[in-house]
Amino acid sequence: LSSWGSNEELQTFKSAFGQHFACFVKADHQRADGEVDHDNLLIRSDKNPNRRTARVLFGDAPLAFAPETDLVLVWGEGADFARLPRGVPVIFLNAFLAPENGHADVFFPISTMLERHGHFTNFAGATSAFAPCFGKAAGVVDAQAVFEALALTQVVATP
């Protein structure tokens, strides 16, 4: 799961799929070699604005796929596709052009935090709102809308 997802997106995912998926929180961004780890003002070692909420909702278990895994959903950048189980269909939600986009069986181009609104809860527990700086490109959708649509499909498909 994306540690850049908003509180609202993470909660929507949990409500829709938390009981159906084994969920693993990933760091979408890592500190670059030579980059300052942290300071006493602005720089934090965790480069992911909502990892705290993601871990509260989904835990911090290391990535491990069960042998019976039959579907993988990857949300956001930073996933190592080489670690995904072979031969298992992959749904990928990503906001950026990346080689992995073409390896997914289903790809959804999603918005960045600059194109949507929501809330993050930081490392200290403070919740802050963010708002769009500009509109989404044609064909781009918010991850929350994807999760809501897939959840609706799941309800309709259940006898």
List the predicted regions and their residue ranges:
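Non-catalytic alpha/beta scaffold blocks inside enzyme catalytic domains
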Residues: S2-P159
